[in-house]
């Protein structure tokens, strides 16, 4: 890629740079070319080579330098149960019976699968990427499909994953930070993990990021020795993700350094995917290739958008403003003070609100968490624990706060309360209703919203909820509680698997928005296929990262920042201690908004809020940008590192080609990791000079080198130097905790603005932010 000087960068849009880079690397955009000879297939794309060998039944993806990215056996394993014996299992491989190419696709056919069935697998190639279409399974036998396993090594005794890349990248692989999403093949992490919506089943605890609906990988070549293994020997990266939703649960099976995406149908239990006949199994998978996995995910998202599968989130000004409002959530105080779930009461809410105001923290939105309801599913407040709940909400609004409310909409504690019965709940295979339990003592059912009567009741309930309580933000929390197909299912089996969550969202979110089109719905998923239903991404919940909440939040922001071009900002909630919160707010500044869960007395580490913590929150709040569509450039990542990987040292935010925010952490002498790629990207080098971490943001629409108003939040005392292309004079207004303000003026000399950041006022109050007015 051609190096851009500083002046060129200031006037080029990000899109034009990416386009120029693509043309430089790949030439003009042309349709992929397909070559076939003697059972060998090869497809030449703009930045990849796709290969298939009929003799080995192996598919291989290479990058433009012909380095292997990923390869594996192509034939999928289809596990079936005879219709007369639900406990029986059959999975035997077939033989390749045909391999042919058409203008834009390659189809491989297999015969004698599971005895007498036929399977066909079709790959399609276009300007958007590589598409693996649903698997066609044609069987003459009365049998139920139990599961479908892509890229499997199948023999008469077993089937195992065969897809191999040296590294796999699986965001959301664990709710905690102890399992890295960057997995080397030698780790031999033998585990099936959710790529779909998630549920409480044996295995790794997963929640944040789900549904994910994709995974990534790249490879290294050490065949000639280890020299340059991670430079010249490192391949580009792939992302493989859903382009539509399957009617089964989506998992990724990891075994002995290889993997296999697989879909669990469990028709042996539910009799809904049954032969004889021709069955469409799986889903459409889109593959993208890019220089690294961050760009490969971005390309996957962008290709879905360009193909018309998804679209950019378009908000009203009101919705965008609510999305980006700094938040305070009661949940951290609830768990610190043992006031979660049925112990949440009116005294606690009043006490917390008074403590918030006394602290000096200045959020614009007050969010009330679990359990303000009297019973799950009723969507009405507890009249015994919270008798004046609606008056409390009115008080919040009178004092200028927006209101956020948490709910797990599909829970139902007492069906009769809402005019339903146990027959309207999800059922187990034996016909009994599925009963779930939260971390407290409450048991509850899960509504079967595929039943029209239940859908109407649920729709009416959420409409009434919106009309009565008038939340500005709805904190949705539920997907992980939908039971797996192996445990329970709805009455209408057309809506099993990943489609079940989509069906529920389509009912409740549509009904809510018909009552309030500007309602902001917040959730923590990373799938692009649910973007129509969510407006704000959340990094919650960080509870399994005690002692390093900031590190885990940084990693989650790294992945969620890719939603910026699609119009979804991120809410950077704190963890459960005050000490890590300023770092989380620093990392959140570029991607959306900030929040706090922290208790105002003592947190889990025995710390309380201080003016210094509060000043950082209030200061970062002044740097937040007012738009929901943006691009992020994470700086300082080490792609292959399990710990340092998928982390950014600094962040640059681009809007309409302009650098409008830079969250800059300078290298620390003696502590700098020299392996970090582009710690100071040449596009942003020397825009800001500082020896302390600092966030510099435009307050208008122009870049920080040209805008007439800036907001600066230094994390320490220093002279901050900012390159300027416009302006001669600057007025600097320093805002301190408690309201003290000082002013200074300076000349802009030689294209540089020098701002003296004084950490404390004469009275000893900590600095919140520096307002700069340039003329």
Please identify what each model-predicted range represents:
Residues 711-723, 748-775:
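C-terminal beta-strand-rich structural cap/linker in extracellular carbohydrate-active enzymes
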Residues 272, 276-288, 500, 504-721, ...:
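Active-site-proximal substrate-binding groove within the catalytic cores of carbohydrate-active enzymes
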Residues 732-757:
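Solvent-exposed beta-strand/loop surfaces of large extracellular or lumenal domains
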Residues 1-16:
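N-terminal secretory signal peptides and thylakoid transit peptides that target proteins
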Residues 43-364, 473:
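Carbohydrate-recognition beta-sandwich/jelly-roll modules
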Residues 328, 396, 661:
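Conserved, mostly hydrophobic/aromatic
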Residues 21-42:
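C-terminal segment of N-terminal export signals and the immediately downstream linker at the start
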Residues 173, 363-579:
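Aromatic- and carboxylate-enriched substrate-binding clefts and catalytic-loop regions
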